[in-house]
Amino acid sequence: MQRKDFVSIVTKGVKVNISLHWWAALLGLALAIGLILRKLNTTYALMLGAVVGCVIGGATLSQTVDIVVSGTQSVMGTVVRVLAAGVLAGVMMESGVANRIAQTIVVTFGEKLAIFALALATMVICAVGVFIPVAVLIVAPIAIEVGSKMHVSKLALLVALSGGGKAGNIISPNPNTIAAASGFDIQPSAVMVSSFIPALFGLGMAVLLATLVQHRGQVVTMDDLNGGENASAKSGGKASRELPSIGRAMVAPAIAVVLLLINPLGSVLGIKALTMFQVDAMYILPFAAIVGLLAMGQGRRILDYTKAGIARMIDMVMILIGAGALGGLITSSDLPDQIVRLITAAGVPGALLAPIAGILMAAATASTSTGVILGASSFGETILAFGTTPVAAAVTMQAGATVIDALPHGNYFHVSAKSMNMSIGERLGVLPFEALIGLTMTVVAVVLNIVF
């Protein structure tokens, strides 16, 4: 497979033909990572890396603007869907729905299956549209209470919570799934359905690892609740208020899941009437949230919850814009070609480029969503040129992005550490187990979507 000698960039009708050096893209990426590690705002770090990479790669100032603008325009579809998902996220987090679901799952399974229940609770909460850091904050107080009674270590509890969250994250209508779907021009529901079995394997691995290490490390106590700074209230604001019943709490997520699955299930079952239902997640997620809110009798709170939801999405949207800019730099260079040559020379099948890109980009940015959008925007065309289907590419890239995405230069590392009152050293000890969980999901995703 050969690449053209130039890259065509179209911005507002202006076409610029330019090819940047691969090393300039790497330097821009390295600069962005370095600035993130130095605690510069992630969006600015990504954009500055893109600008510097373009300039040193041979682009003029005008061409640099075109590259950056073109890159950011490429993620606008994702941005719109993420903002729409904010309505559902606001309702799930602020109304007490997520708290009720978590409590119900843990109470149902009891102490004998406590580790499984905690992992499953985090998985389900993520799967219905709650961000993984918030899901961990919601379940952490319950985990600490149960763990202190059973003398379970902090390590085991966070492995269960983080692993369950990772499993739920790849089958959720969260930004990472939306980014993976948009990057390969498919519906988020297709990614969610195809990621379900890998997610189950991830859940199983999380429970297995947490069970094996439940007596390793410092045992959690009720005093550790203070380390989360009232995490329950912070994550949902419903600690001191009456939670909705489980029946009413399930209305919003149930409607969202059912409507999202109609089209892909129709394709699988060969039912033409179902395949004709092609309503985008941009409509489904806010609709499900509003219906769920009315079912709970909290319709009057819609302005408060939507405001809270979009506030939680703003940071993610800004990061996506920065990632789009950096993606514009990479796609305007011959870096994808160089990586393809390297993979070919090493004898690695080209079909594995999707999960490899997910792993590397997520590690670089310490973010699943940012890793996916960078991987898709930078290597999407190259991946598809190897014959990988869009669904397989999206699913395996997203799974790969869960392997080493929880590094110290990202927000999740510190939020999850605080939820369990862990030191930095203790939190670092969780990383190998998180990587094993993510790797398990990646291998299963590759086997199901690429090998067979």
Where are these predicted regions, by residue range?
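Membrane-core helix-loop-helix motifs of multi-pass transport proteins
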Residues: 16, 144-249, 389, 412-448, ...
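Long, contiguous bundles of hydrophobic transmembrane helices that form the permeation core
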Residues: 5, 11-25, 29, 56-57, ...
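Core transmembrane alpha-helical segments of multi-pass membrane transporters/permeases
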Residues: 44, 66-99, 116, 123-124, ...
